[in-house]
Every structure is written in structure tokens, then in C-alpha cells.
Amino acid sequence: MNSLEQVKGLIKEEIQAAVLKAELATEEQIPNVVLESPKDKTNGDFSTNMAMQLARVAKKAPRMIAEELVANFDKAKASIEKIEIAGPGFINFYMDNSYLTDLIPTIVNAGEAYGETNTGKGEKVQVEFVSANPTGDLHLGHARGAAVGDTLCNLLAKAGYDVSREYYINDAGNQIHNLALSVEARYMQALGLEKEMPEDGYHGADIIGIGKRLAEEFGDRYAKADEKESYEFYREYGLKYELAKLQKDLESFRVKFDVWFSETSLYKNGKIDQALAVLKERDEIFEEDGATWFRSMTYGDDKNRVLIKNDGSYTYLTPDIAYHRDKLERGFDKLINIWGADHHGYIPRMKAAIQALGYDKETLEVEIIQMVQLYQNGEKMKMSKRTGKAVTLRELMEEVGVDAMRYFFAMRSGDSHLDFDMDLAVSKSNENPVYYAQYAHARVCSILRQGEELGLATGGDVNYKLVTSEKEVELLKKLGEFPAVVADAAQKRLPHRITNYAFELAATLHSFYNAEKVLNQDNLELSKARYELMKAVRTTLQNALAIVGVSAPEKM
């Protein structure tokens, strides 16, 4: 626990003690202490509505209760300088700030671990994201989903959850079939044989390249092979190539998955039949008009859903149910799916399936990622100027860089539309939020290099109590918020809170820098304390940016 959390804990304990001392309620009657940080700091560092909460039990006016609580509150134990009562009975606490200086060594000693909390208590969480069809390039929607998903995973891990990142490979549908036929056609053509491309085939240069490589490596072996054997070969080779391309792009984007799960494996391992058997046993499916239906309306869906069509083929929902059953059987406590906006209507039927399988519907959470609109030179950019097609993740990385993409995609709530200004993303100005945050880190590193030249990095005693100016206190308070921000953002699945925090910390640092001469050769004792403060800022900013997947440069 960090110093700020300890102080909040002490205030809560002293509020409870004051309730008992004033005989306003018994221990069993005391409600949970709500302690908030007012946005307007003239209302104190912390505020509680305990007086209003106790009104019914104590049978007194909240204002009177507040006065009794204040009279019985031990300020010294909780590092409180003064207490004020506001409005109908809010109690505002003003810290004496002595606790803040303890934060500096706490943060510096914690290093990369600063900000870690045990909020998740080791809960096993699986996050499935991106999961694009492996037959083409990743586009902007996939890129935003990748950035948000990976940031959420980093955030959950920081908050004490046991996180697994998973990519679901849609390798059982017509698209993979067409890929196999396209590879076959290009292979045959490379051998000089006549073979038409399939109607919905893939005509890109990369598939032509695959065909040529196969011809060079295997000659006409697969042109003469058994049809089934050769088809499987084309399918596997094409899929392997496309997946390798996806993985390369995602790794360049700093996104790595723990598990790549194949849809085809659900068929091969009998998982679909098993899931259907469970639903049948629980009387969750029925036959009608030659088809097999799922009673999803039982669980709030707007209509029942077909699982097996009258021609014997499965609908998309059937392997999805089997896949989610497989996830749950692997022992995850929570499943988080990150889907595109076009999947919004799919949520009720998947939640219904989770319930029909015997699990709580809240086991499944779905985060929706809205569309991205690119802007360049103040105008909407619909297509790539280079290719005339939709802009890809790879192309945008080359245009604006990974840092800008990761930060911009993660700085808004995923369920809100995102306008991505390419000119802003590459500008070296304070208007560019990623540049602003990274520049703050580089500025701190520059100060630390100056401190080393002054001999401040030699160790020895540090008088942290000298760090008391208004701007220093603001900076310390902002540093102290980080673990609570991590915990709250993780619990509420709001990764954009971390980009907000990084920006706020950068702003607080810049404000401090502009107001104070940070290092002063004529006052080395104060400079030593401020040098350590800068180390704490560097650590915290690095840790925040790391969650977002953004680098922290030492020079800019």
C-alpha cells in the first residue's frame, strides 16, 4: 500500500472511531465510509458524507452529526491539518502534507512496481481481442481494438489480475476456403498450368508470391497429389502465411498474444458436439422446421436463434457457443471480449448462451470499439493515398509511428467515435498529447542528468521535508494518485483513464518546472530532495506510459 492509500485508510478508521466515541451508532450500524477527493481543492483533499449517512440511525440533523464527528476526530493520527463542515453536513479534510514526502522514497524504491495493486486478487481474466479474419491486412478498427485491448490487459495485470491475451482465428469459414483455392490457382499458374482464380479469390501480389515459392520448393508434387491432400496443404500453407503477416504487424504494434485459438480445432476436437449435447441435456434447444433452435428468448434475447440449419450446417453462433464454453472450462473467472461496433447486436445472444450453459451472464463482458475516422490537412481521409484502399495498421504505423497510434487510440473511451488527426499525431507541440507526455519524461531525465553533474546522485541522507512549496505539493499529490487510478480504471475497464493520468502528471510537472528553479547549486540540500522528487516523477510517468504501450524517451 502506498502512503496516500494508507492515509485514506487512517481517515476512514478515525471517522469510524469518532462515530463510536460520539455514540452516534453501534459498530454494526456504521455504514461503509465513503471518502472522495473533491475536484475543487478549496473543499479539501478528501470529503465524506458520513453525517448524512448516519442521520436515520442517529436521529439527528446531519449538520449536528457532522459537528459531533469533528469534535471526536483525532486529526494527528490521520495527518489532518484542519477539518471544515460544508453545506448540509459534508465534512472536508485538509491534509498537513507531511505524509506526502514519504511518497518520494516509496516510489523510487518501488521502481517498475509502483502503481501495482492487489485489486484483482489474482482473478483469472481472459481478454479476447482483434480476432480479425486471417485473410487480409489489419485496418484501423482492428488497430484501435488492438491498442485498447492490450492497454486493458496491461492495466489489469498492474492491478493484480491474472490476465491471458487471446486471438480467435476464424479459420473455418468460406474465406479460408477461398484462400486455399487462390493459393492453388497461383501455384498451378507458377508451374505454367492453366487454372482459373476462384470467383471470390484473393488477387493480391502476396498470393502470387506464395504460388511461386511453392512451385520453386515443391515442383509439381501437389499438382499430382491426391485432391484432399493437396487442398489441405494449400489451406495450411496459405493460413500459416497470413497468420505470420498478422503476427508481424501486431508485434510491430507492441501487441503479443498468449494464445492463438483456432476455430477449426472446435470441430476437430468435438467441442461443438459437446456444447450442443450440454444445451440439449439442459433443454435449451428444440427442433422446428427441420432446424435446431436455441431458446435464447428465455434469457432476454429478442428471438430464438438457429444453431443448425435445415441443410445440416451450423450458423455462426454455434461454434461461438462452443468456443465460449471452452474458455470457461479452462477456468477463467471473467471473459472480456473486445468487439467492433457492428457486433453490438450479438451481445444478448452470447450472454444468453453463457447462462444456458449454466454460468452467470456477468461472467462475460463485452467492450465495444467504435469507428475511427482519419483526418489529414483538416479533411477526412477515406482511402490510402498510396494504395487507393482502406488505410492499414502497417501503413499508419509508417506514417505516424507506434507511440502516437497507441496513445491516440487509447485516449478515448472505446465506445466513443474517434477522430484521428494525423497532422496532430506527428506534430512536436504541446497540442499533441503523446508528445506532451513524452516531453515531460525527457525534461525530467534532463534535470536528472544536471543533478548528476552537481553530485546529487551519490546517495546519502535526503531531507524530504524540504519539499513543501505549492507546486511541489501539487506534484506529490498527483504522484500519489497513481495506484488508485490504476485500481479504479482496472475495475471499471477504462484504460483511457491512464492516458488522462499521464497527461495530467505531465501538465503538473511542466507547471512545477516553469514555477521553480528545480536544482540550485547554492542550496544543495533542497536540490537533493528535488532530485529524488524528479526520480519519482520519472518512475511514475514511465509506468503510466508502459501501461499504454508508449515509450518514454530520455531525450527529445
Curated annotation (Swiss-Prot):
Known catalytic reactions: tRNA(Arg) + L-arginine + ATP = L-arginyl-tRNA(Arg) + AMP + diphosphate
GO biological process: arginyl-tRNA aminoacylation
EC number(s) reported in the record: 6.1.1.19
Gene Ontology molecular function: arginine-tRNA ligase activity; ATP binding
This protein's GO CC annotations: cytoplasm
InterPro entries on file: aa-tRNA-synth_I_CS (IPR001412), Arg-tRNA-ligase (IPR001278), Arg-tRNA-synth_N (IPR005148), Arg-tRNA-synth_N_sf (IPR036695), ArgRS_core (IPR035684), DALR_anticod-bd (IPR008909), Rossmann-like_a/b/a_fold (IPR014729), tRNAsynth_Ia_anticodon-bd (IPR009080)
The entry's keywords: Aminoacyl-tRNA synthetase, ATP-binding, Cytoplasm, Ligase, Nucleotide-binding, Protein biosynthesis
Protein localization: Cytoplasm
Coiled-coil positions: none
Matches recorded under PROSITE patterns: AA_TRNA_LIGASE_I (PS00178)
Sequence motif: 'HIGH' region, positions: 132-142
Main location: cytoplasm
Similarity remark: Belongs to the class-I aminoacyl-tRNA synthetase family.
Subunit text: Monomer.
Name under which the protein is recorded: Arginine--tRNA ligase
Organism (species): Bacillus cereus (strain ATCC 14579 / DSM 31 / CCUG 7414 / JCM 2152 / NBRC 15305 / NCIMB 9373 / NCTC 2599 / NRRL B-3711)
Top-level taxonomy: Bacteria, Bacillati, Bacillota, Bacilli, Bacillales
